[in-house]
């Protein structure tokens, strides 16, 4: 028996979900964690608008995000800072540089 096992791609596709938005400028990998559904992702420099269906908690891993939540106020979030987006809402993101993030879904 080998000391390691490489999963077939069909198994990998069932365990990790790949998301791509805005012509590939925003991409994430999603999976179930002990904290619930989570994604780890990257955003190229740019301006984006997203919609939520559940509460989302976003943690900036690298870079800086300017965020406009439904209240209409812009806030800046740096590395290791987090913010929460309400369910069933839209929010705007401006990235002046490439950004990495983690998102937890309630």
Task: Please place each PLM-identified region on the residue numbering.
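Short, surface-exposed secondary-structure edge patches
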Residues: 57, 73-75
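Short, conserved beta-strand element in jelly-roll/cupin
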Residues: 53-66
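A short, N-terminal "cap"/entry segment at the start of jelly-roll beta-barrel domains
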Residues: 1-35
């Amino acid at each position: 028996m080998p000391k390691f096992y490489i999963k077939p791609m069909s198994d990998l596709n069932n365990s990790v979900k790949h998301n791509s938005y805005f012509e590939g400028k925003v991409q994430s990998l999603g999976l179930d964690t002990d904290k619930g559904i989570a994604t780890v992702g990257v955003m190229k420099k740019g301006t984006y608008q997203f919609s939520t269906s559940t509460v989302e908690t976003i943690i900036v891993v690298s870079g800086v995000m300017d965020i406009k939540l439904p209240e209409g106020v812009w806030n800046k979030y740096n590395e290791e800072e987090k913010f929460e987006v309400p369910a069933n809402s839209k929010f705007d993101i401006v990235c002046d540089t490439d950004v990495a993030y983690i998102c937890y879904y309630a």
